[in-house]
Swiss-Prot record:
GO terms for molecular function: metallopeptidase activity; translation initiation factor activity. One of its GO terms (biological process) is formation of cytoplasmic translation initiation complex. One of its GO terms (cellular component) is eukaryotic 43S preinitiation complex. Component of the eukaryotic translation initiation factor 3 (eIF-3) complex, which is involved in protein synthesis of a specialized repertoire of mRNAs and, together with other initiation factors, stimulates binding of mRNA and methionyl-tRNAi to the 40S ribosome. The eIF-3 complex specifically targets and initiates translation of a subset of mRNAs involved in cell proliferation. Pfam families: eIF3h_C, JAB. Keywords: Cytoplasm, Initiation factor, Protein biosynthesis. Belongs to the eIF-3 subunit H family. It comes from Aedes aegypti. SMART domains: JAB_MPN. This is Eukaryotic translation initiation factor 3 subunit H. InterPro entries: eIF3h, eIF3h_C, JAMM/MPN+_dom, JAMM_MPN+_peptidase_M67A, MPN. It is found in: Cytoplasm. Component of the eukaryotic translation initiation factor 3 (eIF-3) complex. It comes from the Eukaryota.
């Protein structure tokens, strides 16, 4: 799958609307805090709005606020967002809507709701982005904030609302070119940088032994379970499409037999001097079958590719730790 992604990447159209995203440290901390709070409350995803402004080819994110998580359907989310931006405007905070953010696990954020939401955002706000925060990877010490935009091919696919194999092939759309990643940088004020430099001196130095922790079975097990679930789902989608193709083949065979029989009957009628029956009567009996959507299998394929990449990277790191631990253990035994 990775080689397939590399082969198809050059055909991707380039979106030059935004060159990079600049995020204030305060907005980044708000996103991190919200996502971790929701992950501890067993909520699937945390979502919120991004506020800022566009300067030339730079999108600046200066503030954010979470979306309501109430299950009450009477709450109007659009009205809630408008009220929030109206109140932020009263206190002289940037109130322009420039996108939204969402939490994700092990970087696997690709889903149908996210695609639809970003399409509506990007068609109404051209410069909008979606920022993905990986809670699990950040909890292991790697801050993961990534900004994405839909590619022109993905937008064209949604505009046409055709997810058949022919339509996807003509648009050259695959899971590897649904999104384009936009570089994101975090900017702090000079006073914040000075304070963080002082705090760094106050933090005691770690010995670094926790980096050699080999208790990675739970993480790898979770990755493999998710990968197996996605493979099973993709297998079910493949079976559905195979059944559709078999049904189409049987219908075509029945249609040809009926047309051949109809031609013989017409020949007999003509020989008797009677008028031939038009073929439209037979054509009406065999209406084209609806083509199943290939959007969901494409998304599942992208999820499988993401899990496979994470497992490969994780195993490489674990092997490096294992060799380092083996060398340290050997050195310790030699000293004894």
């Amino acid at each position: 799958m990775a080689s397939r992604a590399q082969n198809r990447r050059p055909a991707q159209e380039v979106d030059n609307t935004i060159s990079y995203v600049q995020c204030d440290g305060l907005a980044a901390m708000k996103m991190v805090k919200h996502c971790h709070e929701e992950s501890r409350s067993n909520m699937e995803v945390a979502q919120g709005a991004l506020l800022g402004l566009v300067v030339d080819d730079r999108l600046e994110i200066t503030n954010c606020f979470p979306f309501p998580k109430s299950s009450d359907e009477t709450i109007d989310e659009e009205e809630y967002q408008l009220n929030m931006m109206r109140r932020l405007r009263l206190v002289n905070v940037d109130h322009f809507h420039v996108g939204w953010y969402q939490s994700a696990d092990v970087g696997n954020f690709l889903s149908l709701p996210l695609l639809e939401s970003q399409y509506h955002y990007q068609t109404s706000i051209e410069e909008s982005v979606v920022v993905i925060y990986d809670t699990q990877k950040s909890a292991r010490g790697f801050l993961t904030l990534k900004a994405y935009r839909l590619t022109p091919q993905a937008i064209a696919m949604y505009k046409e609302e055709k997810f058949t194999p022919e339509a996807l092939r003509n648009l050259k759309v695959g899971y590897e070119n649904l999104f384009i990643e936009i570089p994101i940088v975090i900017k702090n004020s000079a006073l914040c940088n000075i304070m963080m430099s002082e705090m760094k001196e106050m933090v005691p130095e770690e010995e670094g032994t926790h980096f050699l922790d080999l208790g990675t079975a739970s993480v790898l097990e979770n990755h493999l379970r998710c990968l197996m679930d996605r493979v099973d789902e993709l297998n079910q989608e493949a079976n559905k499409f195979n059944k559709y193709q078999q049904t189409v083949i049987r219908q075509e065979q029945d249609k040809h037999r009926m047309l051949a029989k109809h031609a013989q009957e017409n020949a007999a009628r003509i020989a008797k001097g009677e008028a031939a029956i038009p073929d439209e009567e037979v054509q009406k009996l065999f209406r084209p079958l609806p083509v199943p959507s290939r959007l969901n299998p494409m998304i599942v394929s992208g999820q499988i590719n993401t899990y496979a990449q994470h497992i490969s990277q994780f195993c490489s790191q674990s092997l490096a730790k294992l060799y380092m631990t083996q060398a340290l253990q050997g050195a310790k035994e030699n000293k004894q």
